[in-house]
From Swiss-Prot:
One annotated GO molecular function: RNA-directed RNA polymerase activity
GO cellular component: a single term: host cell perinuclear region of cytoplasm
The UniProt record lists the keyword RNA-binding: no
Organism: Cowpea severe mosaic virus (strain DG) (CPSMV)
Name of the featured protein: RNA1 polyprotein
Domain RdRp catalytic per the UniProt entry, residue ranges: 1419-1549
Single biological process term from Gene Ontology: DNA-templated transcription
Listed PROSITE patterns: PCV_3C_PRO, RDRP_SSRNA_POS, SF3_HELICASE_2
Binding site for ATP: G482, A483, S484, R485, V486, G487, K488, T489
Sequence ranges assigned to domain SF3 helicase in this UniProt record: 450-621
Catalytic reaction equation(s): RNA(n) + a ribonucleoside 5'-triphosphate = RNA(n+1) + diphosphate
């Protein structure tokens, strides 16, 4: 077929429709190739034959339109089977189908026939008919441009770069005006594109420096193709945005495919190249990559064909990768490995070096391709591939940097020397490659590399002789020890080789030291020194003695044989030794052997494994390496390695640690003092000026009265000439009114003087080298201010900071001389790199431009595209900004301003926005509107609430994923990322108010049964959000949303890597529901959507996880989560999956009004809301402590007062203090995250100790039943009943009525056995919690309540501080007791073997046992006290503690999960502070049943963790590091602890180190005895306290623990009268004080007893109420003989009515006993009764039972009384007078009524406790009722009194009987 200019359409059609062509097409279709994909095979099928014919015709018309005047002729077979085949393959792909083929065909036929060509059904989805008209103008314009380019190829090939751009511009503008005037009118910026492209070309040239010399034409081709495609895509998108056209026509695709490919075809066919098909495919690959990148990025969001796949974004790196992958398969088969490189680029954050390496490989492939296919040997391609692959430019810059460092300091330290040696090694490798022929480069580049190597050698020669004589890094020593013939030398040599490779050093970087040689012959500061057979031969000085000064930071001059090397200092970085000896020789004359031992940083012993034979290929295969450290008089094996790899890794890690430590040490030594060099400089400067002042000046000085003469004349900063005089003292003054005719004379005199001065300073033998090298900076006039102050930098910043004070201290006249010198010299500093670069550019420019001129255009385009891609930084910045510009009007403005440059004038003010008045902030950053958003940003409260509560980010490494928080400690995420996160790791969770750590566990992921792209993650460590947030989600969006489109919003928060902040964004969108197939891809991940939301807006990478919000039933709700995007024009969201909403046990959140934005947020707390109006929580505001009369104080000092319970307490005066705020603030700052590996090691050790205490027969850890949880077990130590008088918690407290008490109103029982009352709020909440706590962490609400206690006066008047405790809900406490009661029993029972001392009896022998156990380790004891211990615990530690307890207790997986969730709930809860609601995310609440146990375990974990970390830092042997129990004895009780430390390790582990280490983790610890002390020192045991008790030794075996006296006196000043009368409460206290004082001194106790009897009236009457000293002594003797448990934390709890003064049980032998006819005493322990139903035939009188009155049956009465002290179980005197002795009391009346109504029924007096007081009360009631006569009662009671002495008060009180 012949193509020629002026060819008619009929000529081409005749060829296309000829039978011969049809036959060839049939043959082509039948020709199947291996590389044919499914689309190529499809188009060759019979049914697609017409499409194939149209494609072939389009190609022929393209050729016909592209030929020049001379015409071309192509063989028909070649045209069909090679050129057409290659063309088809470039336009058809499996992923895009035939989309590109349609676009190209449409453009060609539009250009040829000026009409739209229909291709049957193939383009029905591609182009709607009504768009043809408006598209025509644009299509004609592009086709015209495409037709023009081929006809100009010949001419363009000879143009300069400027000509290429101008030619493009000229025709581009002409066609625009002719075919598409609306584009010019609407988008005037399109005509300025080419000016911008010129700037980009220049920018690219500057970026690539010398290697681009002569390549402007290539860059121009590349930039024109890339930027032209980009501009056309932008133009088209802008016209769509402005409404001028309604859809995209892929202008960029038509442009690059038709124009550039056509130009190429013309060239190759003209030259009759036999490889035209290959070249066609090559250039098509290149321009295809460009087209797909630009058009996909800037596609218009409307009018597109429906696509069935979602894609990622494109950019520069992606373009290169695409090109590389295609070229890999296409070019030389031996270069397939490049594909792996390209894939690797995806998996890393692309760095410049990686891109350069990729470009180098691409150019290398093209070089091979050009040579093999075209016979073209390209110098430029070879040079460029080497320069990019080896980063020659970076290598040269590093050489220049080394030279600058040497000149700046006149020396090079060892680190810089190692860089220098590494550069030499790289240079030698490149030289070797060039010599061996592996690297072919031009002579200029070869000379450049040789020049670099030569100058490096010169620099090295000078550098090795100029080391630092100051402080240096201590060398790193590896010392291999072992018997002879075990391979020590071989393993050391292998270590040297591996270290050399690691540091990129050459083979000459190792110096073998012979210790027998007196001189260091051949030492050139090699970084590695090896000493083989260390100490094997005797020498003087010995090898050991020589090593000590070498391995030091002090300077060490060497003994050199050559005079020229004298003064060299040792500063090698690494010393490797092998030796048969591990210790110093006795003859070594080393006086301090520790000095030698400490100089070996890695010491290992080599031995052979007898079970593994020697292997010549791997001599280390049968070696064993034992890492050893010296500690406490012996060597300890720290680790044993059986493989060399492990040893190498260990050595490398130690090397890094050592290097880091040495760098930190050197940084601390920066002392600023005047350099000796500057002292010299100042004296030489004085001398220079003196010598060079002419005789006339000195004569003037002598003759003038003030000795003043002309000094210098110079131009100031404004260019004005000024003259100055000077006197003998050096005072300088400006001369005024100088005759201008003298200017030249004075200037000449000045010039002579200052130039002579400069030469003298420069060449004077005494001028320091540093000054000489930095003189250019000192005389630079631009670095001086108008008053001659120096304000520049001298050399390196470090050097400048050291000498700047000296420069500024120079006298004014000296600074003026330096300034004037610089003016006269006018020098500029040029680096070594700049010098060689300029020379190289001159040589390369001509060679490259000559060569490139003759290249085929195809090669120019491909290479130009690659170079423009890697070098066009300015273009890619523009590209990125446009990719983010969105759609619509914002996009049009962004493009116009980007291309307009400085021509456009932009208004500086902006339209006011009503939203700006109170702009919503998220994470303290204003929410911004997306560029393409159309609506005005006006967010309502529900939208803000969604952002605040539900939006979060999951951050790991440098990746930030958006997630959606749900109530119940869970979040929603997307599969395509989270399904691949299969390893546990620490991540950061960023919420609206804070950031916190989460230990991510893959097993916590939950997949939904549906094919949802969304997945769920649950974790107890997540911070919860309010349950009310469930209302913000729409889980049935498909049903709730309208059909078709509806308005919605998209909310996102993505990481801005420039500012490293998460930026919140909002936009309005139009969404629609779609039900059709959508393929989604992410790397290798693939999935299919069948039902989703779609919105046609510009979404981009990292948008996944954004919230889609719409209005449902009048309220904003989350309807979906963005999970995919397509071509920067469409977004897709998955519907919210159906998440099970957990039931809340408390349902407490309904009482809260949540704030829209949290307040007062810290890491641990944040205020989230307030109690709703009308909700009030009763809290104590007045103390229950009553002050006693002064005479009852017994002369003791008042040291304590009741705590402050409210902010209105009068004792506060003017101080602003709220105890509630103070209580919540202790949780504000929890401690930091701990090293998980070490923490788990500690936990494992503790659990092992627990298992050691387990008795399999007795210790079972199953959960107990509810009754046991409430009542405890009778006779079972440590399992007491729940205190019934304490608060029931929230929200149950809201229903409490006046007179009702706490938990007691929710239980019923007979006084001994209690149960929950069915149907109450507590009972229902208990059932719900039991059911749900295995599945979710319960939402816990606690009431913060100030503690009513006695505090030191300083905490009242000086710095008020009231402790708060937390009241937790009753049902939570009951469930916790059920799950953990057996564990608590176990810990308390084994306190003699464990650290936790909860339950210890301080009066018995346990205190002695405690003291003796501490003294076993010695008498070095740390007595510690924590600050705000309650708020320190983090979720990390709490979760670990749950794992520890589960490990010990076992049980089903459900029970284990229940335990974990219950524990996690208490350190992530709500706290009520008066009317405020706070979120608390750390700490253990004090009202938690396990508080003291958990605090004790936490205390132990902290100390043991600190011990290991401190030992690791001290590098002690592993046997010590992991031997805590061997070297330390620790006891804990909550936050109290004592540590007894063995003397052997007190230098490693002491109070100072413990205090400093804990401080690093946010924990403050002080001396427990003296809390104001700034230090924590060891104490003797007698000087310590524990539980506010001291240690006093009474004998060798007995220690007592007296309570501190300040606490004792307070008991005499204040008493608690909750359950007792005042004098009874005081009696309890005074007895306790006398007992405690007895432990201090029996004489003091006896004296206090006497004072009490003398001063207290009621004690005068009954002195026997106070125990005598003998009785107290007997009390302690009795205590020491028994193992009593003390389960109460303090004395005040002893006054609890549940435990108070119950006499030893005097039970009846039988279940019943008849007192009088029909009146029986009944022991419920033997004959129980159902108290809720009673018994039909009798009246039941329950004594001291607990049952609400409204639940009592008709014939059941309950009588409860408060116990009185010392009254034998009878009620208090006051209650007895009112109810027992009074015949008309309410109790007596109630009994009388019942008996009268049921005269035939028997009466059972039912009781559970002591029968005696019940019998007494019954007798008295019988007297009142007339059933017993007074005389009979008298006799009966008298018998009882005779057997119970405590009842002798009865005759005085009960006068109705006695």
């Amino acid at each position: 077929m012949k193509f020629f200019a002026g060819q008619t359409v009929m000529d081409v059609l005749q060829h296309v429709s000829s039978p011969t062509t049809n036959l060839r097409l049939l043959s082509y279709c039948n020709l199947k190739k291996e590389e044919d994909g499914k689309m190529m095979l499809a188009i060759k099928e019979q049914r697609h034959r017409r499409l194939l014919t149209l494609s072939y015709g389009a190609m022929c018309f393209q050729f016909s339109n592209s030929v020049g005047d001379e015409g071309i002729e192509v063989d028909d077979d070649e045209l069909m089977f090679e050129i057409f085949d290659a063309l088809l393959r470039t336009k058809i792909s499996n992923s895009k189908g035939m989309t590109h083929l349609y676009s190209w065909m449409r453009g060609v036929y539009l250009s040829t026939f000026k009409v739209e060509v229909q291709c049957d059904d193939y383009n029905s989805n591609l182009l709607e008919k009504d768009l043809a008209g408006e598209a025509q103008g644009l299509s004609q314009f592009v086709s015209g441009l495409a037709d023009w380019i081929p006809s100009r190829v010949k001419t363009l090939a000879g143009y300069a770069a400027e000509g290429i751009i101008e030619a493009f511009k000229k025709h581009f503008d002409k066609l625009l005006v002719e075919y598409c005037p609306m584009a010019v009118a609407a988008c005037s910026w399109i005509t300025t594109v080419w000016t911008t492209i010129k700037e980009w070309v220049q920018s690219a040239m500057d970026a690539m420096s010398w290697i681009m010399a002569g390549c402007t034409e290539l860059i121009s081709w590349g930039m024109c193709v890339i930027a032209g495609s980009c501009a056309l895509s932008l133009l088209e998108k802008a016209l769509v945005a402005m409404g001028l056209i309604s859809s995209s026509f892929d202008l960029a695709g038509i442009f690059v495919r038709s124009a550039v490919v056509g130009a190429f075809c013309l060239t190759v066919v003209n030259k009759r190249s036999r490889n035209c098909a290959e070249l066609l495919q090559l250039v098509s690959l290149a321009v295809g990559a460009v087209s797909s990148a630009t058009s996909s990025c800037f596609q218009s969001p409307v009018g597109q064909a429906t696509d069935v796949s979602a894609e990622s974004q494109s950019g520069g790196v992606e373009m290169l990768e695409s090109l590389a992958k295609n070229l890999t398969n296409f070019c030389d088969g031996t270069l397939v490995s490049i594909g792996k490189t390209c894939n690797a680029v995806n998996s890393i954050n692309t760095a410049a070096g990686t891109i350069k390496n990729l470009v180098g490989r691409l150019l290398s492939m093209l070089s091979n391709f050009a040579y093999k296919l075209l016979g073209l040997e390209s110098t430029f391609l070879r040079d460029a591939s080497v320069v990019f692959s080896e980063n020659v430019d970076g290598w040269l810059k590093q050489i220049s940097w080394c030279q600058d460092q040497f000149l700046a300091k006149a020396y090079i330290n060892q680190d810089e020397l190692m860089v220098l040696r590494s550069l030499i090694t790289r240079g030698e490798v490149m030289q070797r490659e060039m010599i061996m022929g592996g690297m072919k480069v031009s002579p200029t580049v070869c000379g450049l590399i040789n020049k670099g190597c030569t100058d490096l050698a010169k620099l090295m020669a000078g550098a090795v002789m100029h080391g630092t004589s100051g402080t240096r890094k201590i060398p790193f020593v590896v010392y291999a020890h072992g018997a002879s013939r075990v391979g020590k030398t071989m393993v050391i040599n292998r270590l040297i080789e591996d270290f050399r490779k690691e540091l990129e050093l050459g083979e000459d970087c190792v110096y073998p030291r012979n210790v027998v040689d007196d001189y260091w012959s051949g030492y050139k500061r090699q970084p590695i020194v090896v000493i083989d057979d260390f100490g094997a031969v005797s020498s003087d000085p010995s090898a050991e003695a020589q090593l000590i000064p070498l391995i030091s930071s002090a300077p060490y001059p060497l003994n050199m044989a050559d005079l020229s090397e004298k003064g060299m200092h040792f500063d090698s970085a690494i010393v490797m030794c092998s030796s048969n000896f591990i210790e110093c020789s006795p003859e070594s004359k080393v006086r301090d052997e520790m000095a030698f031992r400490n100089r070996r940083h890695v010491l290992f012993t080599v031995s052979l494994d007898p079970n593994i034979p020697y292997d010549g290929d791997d001599i280390t295969k049968n070696q064993i390496y034992e890492i050893k450290t010296w500690f406490h008089d012996s060597y300890h094996v720290e680790a044993t390695f059986t493989s060399y790899g492990d040893l190498l890794a260990y050595c490398k890690n130690k090397w890094v640690e050592h290097n880091t430590e040495q760098e930190a040490n050197l940084k601390q030594l920066g002392v600023k003092k005047e350099s000796v060099a500057f002292q010299q400089f100042r004296s030489i400067l004085d001398l220079a000026v003196f010598v060079n002042q002419d005789a006339e000046n000195f004569k003037q000085r002598l003759e003038t009265p003030d000795g003043r003469c002309h000094f210098v004349s110079c131009y100031d900063k404004s260019g004005i000439l000024r003259h100055y005089t000077i006197d003998a003292t050096g005072d300088v003054q400006e001369m005024e009114k100088v005759d201008s005719s003298l200017d030249d004379i004075l200037l000449e005199k000045t010039n002579k003087m200052v130039l002579a001065a400069y030469k003298m300073i420069k060449y004077h033998k005494d001028t320091n080298l540093v000054i000489k090298t930095q003189l250019a900076d000192l005389v630079d006039p631009t670095k001086y201010t108008a008053d001659f102050q120096f304000d520049g930098v001298i050399g390196s910043p470090l050097f400048s900071s050291q000498v700047m004070p000296s420069v500024k201290a120079l006298p004014l006249w000296q600074r003026m001389v330096l300034y004037t010198v610089g003016q006269n010299l006018g020098r500029t500093h040029s680096s070594w790199y700049e010098g060689i670069k300029d020379k190289c550019m001159l040589a390369l420019s001509k060679a490259y431009s000559t060569e490139i001129k003759d290249w085929p255009v195809a090669l120019k385009i491909v290479v130009g595209v690659i170079l423009a891609t890697v070098a066009g930084k300015a273009f890619w910045r523009f590209y990125a900004s446009m990719a983010d510009a969105g759609n619509g009007g914002h996009f049009v403005g962004a493009v116009a301003s980007a291309f307009a440059g400085s021509q456009a004038v932009v208004a500086q003010s902006r339209k006011p926005n009503r939203f700006d008045v109170a702009q919503y902030r998220y994470r303290n950053i204003p929410l911004r509107k997306r560029n393409w958003a159309e609506g005005q940003m006006s967010l309502d409260q529900s939208t803000m609430l969604i952002m605040e509560k539900c939006k979060a980010n999951f951050v790991f490494s440098n990746i930030s994923c958006q997630i959606v928080m749900l109530p119940g400690r869970q979040f929603l995420c997307y599969k395509h990322v989270f399904a691949s996160l299969n390893s546990p790791m620490y991540v950061d969770i960023y919420t609206a108010n804070k950031k916190y750590k989460l230990y991510y566990k893959p097993q916590n992921r939950v997949y939904f049964e549906t094919d949802s792209e969304i997945m769920l993650y649950k974790d107890a460590s997540l911070e919860d959000i309010p349950a009310s947030c469930w209302d913000l989600f729409c889980f049935d969006a498909e049903k709730s949303l309208p059909r078709g489109s509806f308005p919605a919003e998209i909310l996102s928060c993505k990481l801005d890597r420039t500012t490293n902040q998460h930026i919140p964004e909002w936009a309005d969108i139009s969404a629609r529901t779609v039900n059709q197939k959508l393929d989604v891809e992410f790397g290798e991940y693939q999935t299919i959507f069948y039902s989703y939301l779609q919105y046609d807006v510009s979404t981009k990478a990292e948008d996944c996880g954004s919230l889609i919000i719409a209005t449902i039933d009048g309220r904003k709700k989350i309807i979906g989560i963005h999970t995919a995007g397509r071509a920067n024009r469409s977004g897709f969201a998955s519907y919210m999956p159906q998440v099970e909403i957990p039931v809340q046990a408390q349902a407490a959140e309904k009482f809260f009004d949540f704030l829209e934005k949290e307040q007062h947020v810290t890491e641990g707390i944040g205020k989230v809301g307030n109690l709703k109006k009308g909700v009030w929580v009763p809290l104590p505001t007045k103390t229950n402590l009553v002050e006693t009369p002064k005479e009852w104080h017994l002369g003791t000092e008042k040291t304590k007062e009741p705590s402050i319970l409210s902010s209105t307490d009068l004792r506060l005066g003017d101080k602003q203090y709220d105890p509630f705020v103070g209580g919540i603030q202790k949780y504000a700052e929890p401690m930091g995250i701990l090293d998980d590996e070490v923490l788990r090691h500690v936990a494992t050790d503790i659990v092992e100790e627990w298992f050691d205490c387990v008795d399999p027969q007795e210790d079972t850890f199953e959960e107990v039943d509810l009754q046991v949880a409430i009542n405890g077990l009778e006779g079972m130590e440590y399992m007491e009943r729940v205190p019934m008088a304490t608060s029931e918690g929230f929200p149950h407290i809201l229903t409490r009525k006046s007179g009702e008490k706490g938990k007691g109103r929710f239980v019923y029982g007979d006084g001994e056995i209690f149960d929950l009352i069915p149907g109450t709020s507590v009972h229902e909440a208990y059932l719900t919690l039991e059911e749900t706590c295995a599945d979710t962490v319960p939402a816990l609400v606690g009431i913060e309540c100030p503690k009513d206690e006695k505090l030191p006066l300083r905490k009242i008047y000086e710095k008020p501080k009231t402790r708060c405790f937390t009241v937790l809900p009753m049902e939570y406490n009951l469930v916790v007791r059920r799950k953990f009661l057996k564990f608590v029993v176990f810990i308390m029972k084994n306190r003699h073997r464990l650290s936790c001392q909860v339950g210890i009896n301080p009066y018995g022998m346990e205190w002695s046992r405690l003291a003796m156990s501490l003294l076993e380790k010695g008498n070095n004891i740390l007595c510690c006290d924590y600050s705000s211990f309650d708020g320190l615990l983090t979720k990390q530690v709490m979760h670990l503690m749950s794992e520890m307890i589960n490990e010990l207790c076992g049980g089903s997986s459900r029970l284990k999960q229940q335990r974990t969730n219950l524990l996690m709930a208490c350190c992530s809860r709500y706290a009520l502070c008066k009317g405020e609601v706070w979120r608390v995310e750390c700490g253990i609440p004090s009202g938690f049943p396990l508080t003291v146990i958990c605090n004790s375990i936490f205390n132990e974990l902290l100390v043991r963790y600190s011990y290991i970390k401190i030992c690791q830092q001290a590098r002690v042997p592993a046997t010590i590091t992991y031997g805590f129990s061997t070297f330390v004895k620790m006891v804990t009780y909550g936050d109290d602890n004592l540590l007894s430390v063995q003397s052997a390790i007190t230098h490693v582990f002491d109070g100072t180190k413990l205090k400093e280490f804990l401080k690093l983790n946010g924990i403050t610890i002080t001396d427990g005895k003296d809390k104001t002390s700034p230090v924590l020192n060891f104490r003797n045991l007698e000087d310590c306290d524990f539980l506010k008790r001291g240690f006093k030794k009474e004998s060798d075996v007995v220690w007592v623990g007296p309570e501190e006296k300040e606490s004792l006196w307070a008991q005499l000043h204040y008493v608690t009268t909750n359950n007792l009368e005042k004098h009874e409460a005081y009696l309890v206290n005074v007895v306790n004080v006398i007992r405690e004082l007895y432990l201090h001194d029996p004489r003091e106790a006896a004296e206090l007893r006497r004072k009490a009897i003398q001063n207290v009236d009621f004690l005068k009457e009954n002195p026997k109420d106070l125990p005598t000293m003998a009785a107290i002594k007997e009390f302690y003797n009795m205590q020491r003989q028994q193992q009593f448990v003390d389960s109460n934390d303090n004395l005040d709890s002893l006054l609890n009515p549940d435990f108070l003064f119950v006499a030893p049980h005097r039970k009846m032998h039988e279940a019943e006993m008849e007192l009088v006819p029909k009146w029986y005493l009944r022991d419920l322990g033997k004959a129980p009764i159902n108290v809720l139903t009673g018994e039909a035939d009798r009246i039941c009188v329950l004594v001291n039972a607990s049952i609400p009155d409204h639940l009592l049956p008709e014939k059941v009465v309950n009588i409860s009384w408060p116990y009185g002290p010392g009254r034998g179980g009878l009620p208090t005197h006051g209650w007895a007078q009112a109810n027992l002795y009074n015949p008309n009391s309410a109790v007596v009346k109630k009994l009388r009524t019942l008996v009268n109504q049921n005269p035939d029924d028997r009466v059972d007096i039912c009781f559970r406790h002591d029968a005696v007081p019940v019998a007494i009360a019954t007798i008295i009631f019988l007297v009142h009722l007339g059933k017993v006569k007074g005389r009979s009662a008298n006799e009966y009671l008298t018998k009882i009194i005779d057997s119970a002495k405590s009842l002798k008060f009865l005759p005085k009180e009960c006068d109705i009987i006695f």
